[in-house]
């Protein structure tokens, strides 16, 4: 598979290159704030950079008829409209979190929330000091799995890749469910699965849950 990275020189960009290269995939498109290096036509473009970069990413996907794996957070309606328009021409996977564990947790939370519908629920999320958006896209994703609005507490400290704790409480007992990303590698592994999934797919919007669970 030939692939491109938007945000190539960033921390996630470097992690993505490492994981993809270990599987023998060829980096043929590099995009960062310093410019664009186009070596060949990519099958898939991976973007974990910023919302401001999305117009250029969409332009490149259309130019090369390349699928898009998008892990950028803090997206607005205008960005989702760009993705919907792009998905008429190429396959797209957009997710706020490409950790397989988080997406398994999301499915589990939906069932737990149904059973514990009368319990109090709150979410605590912790990320590195450089993360700009709060609450995190992942916390919002987990909240959506609960099926209702709940308090979300955001901490920005040190170099934490990502901790999410969902706390259910009732009189006399609590349940805490925690997911911890040990390193950014987990997100790059998820991006790889999504990229390989997109190769040969018809145009359209695909969820990361479809990548993981298929038609289940």
UniProtKB/Swiss-Prot annotation:
Gene Ontology biological process terms, A to Z: diaminopimelate biosynthetic process; lysine biosynthetic process via diaminopimelate
Coiled-coil regions listed: none
CDD domains (UniProt xref): DHDPR_N
List of catalytic residues: 127 (proton donor/acceptor), 131 (proton donor)
Keywords carried by this UniProt record: Amino-acid biosynthesis, Cytoplasm, Diaminopimelate biosynthesis, Lysine biosynthesis, NAD, NADP, Oxidoreductase
Pathways involved: Amino-acid biosynthesis; L-lysine biosynthesis via DAP pathway; (S)-tetrahydrodipicolinate from L-aspartate: step 4/4
GO molecular function, one term: NADP binding
EC class of the enzyme, as a word: oxidoreductase
Assigned EC number: 1.17.1.8
Catalysed reactions, as listed in the record: (S)-2,3,4,5-tetrahydrodipicolinate + NAD(+) + H2O = (2S,4S)-4-hydroxy-2,3,4,5-tetrahydrodipicolinate + NADH + H(+); (S)-2,3,4,5-tetrahydrodipicolinate + NADP(+) + H2O = (2S,4S)-4-hydroxy-2,3,4,5-tetrahydrodipicolinate + NADPH + H(+)
Function summary: Catalyzes the conversion of 4-hydroxy-tetrahydrodipicolinate (HTPA) to tetrahydrodipicolinate.
Family: Belongs to the DapB family.
Protein known as: 4-hydroxy-tetrahydrodipicolinate reductase
Species: Thermotoga petrophila (strain ATCC BAA-488 / DSM 13995 / JCM 10881 / RKU-1)
């Amino acid at each position: 598979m030939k692939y491109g990275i938007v945000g190539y020189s960033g921390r996630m960009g470097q992690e993505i290159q490492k994981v993809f290269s270990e599987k023998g995939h060829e980096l043929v498109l590099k995009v960062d704030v310093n410019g664009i290096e186009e070596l060949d036509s990519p099958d898939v473009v991976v973007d974990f950079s910023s919302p401001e970069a999305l117009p250029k990413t969409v332009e490149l996907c259309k130019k090369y008829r390349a699928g898009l794996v998008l892990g950028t957070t803090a997206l607005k309606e205008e960005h989702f409209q760009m993705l919907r328009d792009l998905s008429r021409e190429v396959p797209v996977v957009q997710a706020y979190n490409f950790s397989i564990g988080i997406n398994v947790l999301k499915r589990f939370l939906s069932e737990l929330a149904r059973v514990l519908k009368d319990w109090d629920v709150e979410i605590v999320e912790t990320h590195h000091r450089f993360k700009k958006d709060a609450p995190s896209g992942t916390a919002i994703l987990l909240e959506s799995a609960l099926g209702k609005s709940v308090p979300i507490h955001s901490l920005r400290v040190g170099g934490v890749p990502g901790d999410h704790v969902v706390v259910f409480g009732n009189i006399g007992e609590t349940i805490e469910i925690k997911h911890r990303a040990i390193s950014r590698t987990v997100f790059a592994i998820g991006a790889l699965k999504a990229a390989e999934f997109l190769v040969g797919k018809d145009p359209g919007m695909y969820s990361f849950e479809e990548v993981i669970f298929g038609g289940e």
